[in-house]
Amino acid sequence: MKNFLVHDEKTKAEMLDYLNINSVEDLFKQIPDAVKTNSLNIENAVSEMETQKRIKSLAKKNKTEYISFLGGGVYNKFIPACIAQVAQRFEFLTAYTPYQPEISQGTLQVMYEFQSMICELTGMDISNATVYDAATASAEAVLMSVRITKKYKALVSNKINPQYKSVIKTYCWANSIEIEWFNDIPLNTSGYACVIIQNPDYYGEITDIKQVDTLLIAVVDISTLSVLKPPYEADIVAGDIQGLGIPMEYGGPHAGFIACREKYLRQIPGRLAGRTADADGNQAFCLTIQTREQHIKREKATSNICSNQALIGLCGTLYLSLLGKNGFYQAGYLSAKNAHELSKRLADKNIKTVNKNFFNEFTIEVKDADRFLANLKSKNVLGGIKIDDTHILVAATEMTTEDDINAYVENIPS
């Protein structure tokens, strides 16, 4: 992630071979040795993320911050500094919906690039240009499946985020859709509009996605797809992009997304940016398939969400562009590595991890969850989210340091 260069070792080797040189140093061999400085008394270069960590570690000597192992849909992720600078430009910082493409090409192109990136990550054909968050994306996906199948029953996993479940319940109640909850997918699903699962689920468990006899909706945290394979088996993918350079900020704002197969294009909610040509034949961008939307269809629109969180989508687009494929993978790898290291250290303290397979979030079993978390909090460690009296959801990210893990393990109550 250093300097946001996306070149890996293979790419560097190909460039050196093309230039017919052996190393980067060969580019400077024309400079006389007499004028070169052999060594400088400075450390090797580090990435922006590592620099921020080092500066924050010095600032933390005042002990004013908590170490966070909270997750459950909101994560302490690394945010490149330039994201805020670009997002605050007046050209982007607007509530205006780009209905007039002739004056909105920048915003429309960002929306188009966002959709393209989501499609690449999820393996779907089409993505919208954001909705509010993963909760509304999940609920809107259920309504979308009902419009497609004309069936008013939905199978919803008990293991999805409780906040998502709450919003799904509200949407389904208002639209007379019956919900059946499950722990394991039933063998016969043909009588339902959809089966909706979360992977990894709320408790952090990674599960194999099975084929079903109806529409399959997969709810994902997009940052997990830096390492995990895309949910190709799904018909609709819903999720959140908070992990793509969006601060936690008291729980919002977030941005959700819905991606799907091309054949469901006219049922997807939210705005769609398309690429076209202007009167002179030049590439241009515009909102497309607008007959689905409320400014045309009114109460018959596929969705009545008025804001599309485009500014948050811009932040996610910038994040992916800055890190590149390799940087995005590295962030995911570090998150998983830190989580598994913490789980191992907890096991050494006889704290059991319930999960068989997990990414960066897992559930632990303790004797008294309230006492366990209170003791950690008194030591400036937010140890996780209480699930019940004996279980806690714990998350780690690329921002989790070895000192953070030590602070957690060393302050476990006896």
Predicted regions and their residues:
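N-terminal entrance/gating region of PLP-dependent enzymes' catalytic architecture
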Residues: 33, 37-112, 296
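Conserved PLP-enzyme active-site core in the AAT-like
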Residues: 15, 136-282, 346-349, 363-366, ...
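Short loop-beta-helix segment that forms the pyridoxal 5′-phosphate
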Residues: 99-103, 119-139
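Compact, charge-rich alpha-helical regulatory domains located at protein termini
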Residues: 1-39
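Contiguous, well-ordered alpha-helical segments that form the cores/surfaces of helical PPI scaffolds
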Residues: 116, 136-144, 314-318
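Conserved C-terminal alpha-helix-loop-beta "cap" of PLP-dependent enzymes
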Residues: 326-408
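Active-site C-terminal subdomain of aminotransferase-like
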Residues: 244-349, 354-356
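General small-molecule cofactor/ligand-binding pocket signal
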Residues: 127, 178-182, 354
